[in-house]
Amino acid sequence: EICREIFNIIDYTTLINLTDIEPLQYSEYGVDDEYGWHRDVHDEPYYNGLVRKVSFSTILNTDFEGGEFDIETNNPTDKKRYQTFKTGKYNTIIFPAHMWHRVRPVKSGVRKSIVGWLLGRP
């Protein structure tokens, strides 16, 4: 349901042409787990001839430390060059799939999240 809601909001408020939703992915990060800098786009269409246009991540719990979500800002005047998000339970981060992002190492507990991708024609 959250997927469809995000799809509708982006479809109606932006010029991004969305046509489908990729299956959701459930993730758990334990102590010292992380996901390094990466982008969610592929070089060629791969899912029914579509590409990832929009990514989102929803945190499912708060009983963990660390595991912050960073997105590169592409701002050359910003020394840090990324923005850090430490979200609350069920908060969702939505961003263009071509942006570099990462999950920092979890220090304690287990970070649980659902991630998904909204798709469109290349």
Please place each PLM-identified region on the residue numbering.
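Fe(II)/2-oxoglutarate oxygenase catalytic core
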Residues: 1-94, 98-122
